[in-house]
Structure formats: structure tokens, C-alpha cells
Amino acid sequence: MFGKSIEAYTKACEVIPGGVDSPVRAFKSVGGTPPFIKKGKGAYLYDVDGNKYVDFVQSWGPLIFGHCDKDIEKVVIKTAKKGLSFGAPTKLETKLASEIVEMYDNIDKVRFVSSGTEATMSAIRLARGVTGKNDIVKFEGCYHGHSDSLLVQAGSGLATFGSPSSPGVPSDLTKHTLLCEYNNIKNLEKCFADSSDIACIIIEPIAGNMGLVPASEEFLKACRELCDKHGALLIFDEVMSGFRASLTGASGIVKTKADIITFGKVIGAGMPVGAFAASKEIMSNLSPEGKIYQAGTLSGNPVAMAAGLKSLRKLKANPDIYDELNKKALRLVNGLKKIANKYEIPFQVDTRGSMFGFFFCEKEPKNFKDVGLCDFKRFATFHHEMLKKGFYFACSQYETGFICTKITNKDIDACLKAANEVMKNL
């Protein structure tokens, strides 16, 4: 069933570290060999062995309209024919930035970059420059990209490999990263009591790299109040949740407002792009207006801007999309929960918009430590058995799943039928 993928992976390992260009893809969390994908269309992936899968990963979130959406595909081809990159300003950047600014009451200006990592890295530099302080607060299990100062208990791939941080990261950098427990207000208060040099808190308001674990309203309120009290800035990392959890991401669901928001994934519709945004008072500190430097050769490249612009305009023109996506996500996870209960399997589920998560555990996880208590062996078995039946879930208990518009109720019901067969023997 996977012979050609195994062959492809073996060859890849000879010239690419671990055979992949992002660690989680190597299936280390669940074991085995990853399928090598040949193409995607709509809700489906097709691998080199000819296997077809309903895709509940959607490239880890960007493809809210599924693979090869005709509207996005059309503008990408049209734009690419005019040039892939100019290293000069284009109107497309202004149009996409304007679309984003119009949607948020706490954003005046946007700066585009080429990845989510660049977005969070730049947002932290901006916060440090604006406040004149050095320390940053992050939370166990929240992943903010692979820049040096953020690779501390980062969840996702690092969690899979059991690394609290990565070799190659100088202690001189991580000493300014203060680690707190997610959803633990007392722990956060102590952090601020211990340091008078905190520039910012960076948080995933809906954590997606320890499975799906939302921050409580009380916790986000505490983040806001502590930042205001101590002259720090609050950064929402919405690289994953932006335009996914709702039209305005997690920011549109929670009551707390951030000073800086980072974006990625959906705003590129599958193209490499990231962004960070804030008020004009904060953003005016960026070069060339201000003294805080940030740059990128491919930042704001026209193809990514065109794809993102079409994606956002489609979302804004169809406000019912999020309700429909959430209903599908609930149909899936509630169905899985019902099956798990039938077979007396400890199982927890949650959704936010088109994002979903499930855990093989007794109680609903509230933080990284809770997720670590889940049954990872059972998850791995479930993952592989569902893969054999044609359903492609995230290959780690620490990852979030995604619904796209092309996934149908028929696809979900077929998935639940397969899950019933798997869980009765799990």
C-alpha cells in the first residue's frame, strides 16, 4: 500500500536530513513512513502509491478552500505570468494590507514577511524596541516558529522530539525568554514579579501546537492587565488561528485585545507568507519610518499577495463559511467522541471555527503538561489505521486538525464509519 512512499522516503533521507524539510512530517510521533504526496484536489490528497485520502491537515492550516481552489489558482497563474518577484513595491501589498486593516479595530498598519517564524521574530523585536526592555514571556507548548529565543518548550515538533530547547541556541539568547505555564494566572503573575525587564507576552490565544487548547478568557484578561500594569506589549500569535477560528481569527472570538498580531497560513492560501500588524503608533517605529530594522527580499512578493488577497476576499464575501465549517468540525469530533464513549475509550475533543483537536485522555487538557499525559500509543495506532482507510489526520497528538470548504458531510460520515471500525479494536 505504501511501497513507493517507502522508496521515496529512503531516497530522500540520503540527501535531506531526516528525509523531510520540517520535522513533524517524518512521522516520528506516530512511527512508520510518511506517505509521499503526488497531488491535492479539493478535500483530497493523492500519494505516489495511488492512495486517496480525505485531508484533515490541509497543509497545516492554510488551505481553507481546499487544494487547487479554482479562484485562487487562477489569480496565482495570472500574477505569476507577470513576474514572480520584483524586490520593489506593488499595489497588491497595499490592497492585502488594506483588507486586513479594515477587519480589525486595533490594527492600522501591516508589514508582510515570508513566514510565520519571521512574523513572530519581527513582532518581538518590535516590542523590545518600543518598550526598551529585553525579556519576553512565552508559554509551555506554544510554538512561535524556530527563531532562537522562541525555541523553549515550544510544543509541536520539539515536543515530539522531547527537546525543551534546541542545540545551537545560545543560552545568552534564551536567558531573556521567561517560560510560564499556559492558563496559569498565578505562575504568570510570579513571572512579572520576578522581572522588571519584560517587553512582551507572546501567546497563541488558541494554542494549536499542543493539540487544540484554547486560553481561558480569565487568563487572556490577566495577560492584558499585567502587560498594561508593567509597560509591556501583548502579542497574539495568530499564524494558525488567524482567519481560521473566525473571519478575524481568535481576536474575533475572545474579549481581550492584543497590541500586536502575527499572521500566516490562510493569508497566503498555501503560498509562503506571514505578517505582523499593530497600531500606527507601534508600527511607526519600524524602518524606514523608525529605527527598528526589519527586511526581506521576498517579503510581499506578488504571487503570495495575489493568493492571499483572493482568499480573504472570498472569505469576506461569504460570511456563512465559518458557521458551515464549524458545524462540520463539530460533526466530526462529536461523532468521534460518541464512538469513543461507546467503546469506553478516554477521549476529549474541542473546536474553534474550522480548527479541531482530539485527545486520548481522561480529562480535557488545559496546558502542555496535561497533553503530555495523553495516550500517545493509542493515538499512533488510530492515526495509522485511519490512514490505511483513507483519512489523513495530523501525524502528532501535539498538532491541530483543519476542515476546508471542500470537505463534505459525506466525507465526515465515511470517516466516522471507519473510525468506528478502528476504535472497536483500539
UniProtKB/Swiss-Prot annotation:
SUPFAM superfamilies: PLP-dependent transferases. Homodimer. It is an enzyme of class 5 (isomerase). The keyword Isomerase applies. GO terms for cellular component: cytoplasm. One of its GO terms (molecular function) is transaminase activity. NCBIfam families: hemL, PRK00062.1. Gene3D superfamilies: Aspartate Aminotransferase, domain 1, Type I PLP-dependent aspartate aminotransferase-like (Major domain). Pathway: Porphyrin-containing compound metabolism; protoporphyrin-IX biosynthesis; 5-aminolevulinate from L-glutamyl-tRNA(Glu): step 2/2. It comes from Aliarcobacter butzleri (strain RM4018) (Arcobacter butzleri). It is found in: Cytoplasm. Belongs to the class-III pyridoxal-phosphate-dependent aminotransferase family. HemL subfamily. The keyword Isomerase applies. Its EC number is 5.4.3.8. Its main location: cytoplasm. This is Glutamate-1-semialdehyde 2,1-aminomutase. InterPro entries: 4pyrrol_synth_GluAld_NH2Trfase, Aminotrans_3, Aminotrans_3_PPA_site, PyrdxlP-dep_Trfase, PyrdxlP-dep_Trfase_major, PyrdxlP-dep_Trfase_small. It catalyses: (S)-4-amino-5-oxopentanoate = 5-aminolevulinate. Keywords: Cytoplasm, Isomerase, Porphyrin biosynthesis, Pyridoxal phosphate. One of its GO terms (biological process) is protoporphyrinogen IX biosynthetic process. The modification N6-(pyridoxal phosphate)lysine is found at residue 265. It comes from the Bacteria.
